[in-house]
Amino acid sequence: MKSRLKSYRRKKLGLATVIVFCSLCFLFGFYGSTLLSQNVPRVKPRLRMLDMVENGEEEASSMPHGVTGEESIGSIPFQVLSWRPRAIYFPNFATAEQCQAIIERAKVNLKPSALALRKGETAENTKGTRTSSGTFISASEESTGALDFVERKIARATMIPRSHGESFNILRYELGQKYDSHYDVFNPTEYGPQSSQRIASFLLYLSDVEEGGETMFPFENGSNMGIGYDYKQCIGLKVKPRKGDGLLFYSVFPNGTIDQTSLHGSCPVTKGEKWVATKWIRDQDQEE
């Protein structure tokens, strides 16, 4: 009887010891992790923004409002407008002063906009397709640094090296001028072999437009593709130009095939005028 009682007490004592030991481990782990975590900076939840990090340095918190700098982290707010095509809108991408500086630089060199002709097309039978005027300017040719700033920011927003971009095409659309629906990508079956391909386009709106002048995507989300679409119609998803805002859209899928829903155009300006800086981005380095 006594031996059974001793055995029972040993089992009871052993169970109590295990419970106490586990409790101490829990408390040590809980408070230990709390103390250790006090020296670790808190990570704020990410908003729907693109982080810009330069020089490989990353800060845990953003800079105060109104402060900027080349060695700082910043954020580029954006809004997804469409997944078919992939179109992203960037409000306040450039300042009004930067936009005006770009316009002033481009004004003196404007010429009627030209078209890349497909097989069978001529300047005569495509007359009226694109009625704007424009000029090509590289970032290094603009003395105020506005285009250089925009080009670097586009590279950070797209995560594509700036050397993959063509020179800026600065365009002016006056009353009634427009650009019928078209693709920025060059289909080899229509244009012949290409040494590199346009994969994305970035539009920086340099002015407000009182009426008209929207960038439109008639095939957005697959709409209007089977109705015998007239390429002069201004229908589908429309983006109203606002000074300083940017629009990015992709012409190809990640596998390199053409996104048919990236068809787009510029609606006729019905009041005022429209200024825009276009940056075409290619799949290969353009400086080689």
From Swiss-Prot:
The name this protein goes by in its record = Probable prolyl 4-hydroxylase 9
- Lumenal side: which ranges? 34-288
Which residues are exposed on the Cytoplasmic face of the membrane? 1-12
Chief localisation class = endoplasmic reticulum
The membrane-topology field of this record reads: Single-pass type II membrane protein
The cofactors required by this protein are: Fe(2+); L-ascorbate
Coiled-coil ranges (or none): none
Q: Which residues cross the membrane?
A: 13-33
Q: Which reaction does it catalyse?
A: L-prolyl-[collagen] + 2-oxoglutarate + O2 = trans-4-hydroxy-L-prolyl-[collagen] + succinate + CO2
Question: Can you provide one Gene Ontology molecular function annotated for this UniProt record?
Answer: iron ion binding
Task: Decide whether keyword DNA-binding is in the record.
Answer: no
Q: What PANTHER family does the annotation carry?
A: PROLYL 4-HYDROXYLASE 9-RELATED, PROLYL 4-HYDROXYLASE ALPHA SUBUNIT
Which InterPro entries does the record associate with it?
A: Oxoglu/Fe-dep_dioxygenase_dom, P4HA-like, Pro_4_hyd_alph, Pro_4_hyd_alph_FE2OG_OXY
Asked whether the keyword Electron transport is assigned, the reply is no
Q: Where does Fe cation bind?
A: 182, 184, 264
What is known about what this protein does?
Catalyzes the post-translational formation of 4-hydroxyproline in -Xaa-Pro-Gly- sequences in proline-rich peptide sequences of plant glycoproteins and other proteins. Hydroxyprolines are important constituent of many plant cell wall glycoproteins such as extensins, hydroxyproline-rich glycoproteins, lectins and arabinogalactan proteins.
Q: Give the gene that encodes this protein.
A: P4H9
Question: Where does it live in the cell?
Answer: Endoplasmic reticulum membrane; Golgi apparatus
- EC number(s) given by UniProt: 1.14.11.2
List residues binding 2-oxoglutarate.
274
Positions bearing carbohydrate = 221, 255
Quote the cofactor binding remark.
Binds 1 Fe(2+) ion per subunit.
Residue span(s) of domain Fe2OG dioxygenase: 164-283
Key words, A-Z: Dioxygenase, Endoplasmic reticulum, Glycoprotein, Golgi apparatus, Iron, Membrane, Metal-binding, Oxidoreductase, Signal-anchor, Transmembrane, Transmembrane helix
- Per its UniProt entry, which superkingdom is the organism in? Eukaryota
The organism encoding this protein is Arabidopsis thaliana (Mouse-ear cress)
- Which cysteine pairs make disulfide bonds? none
Any one Gene Ontology cellular component term annotated for this protein: Golgi apparatus
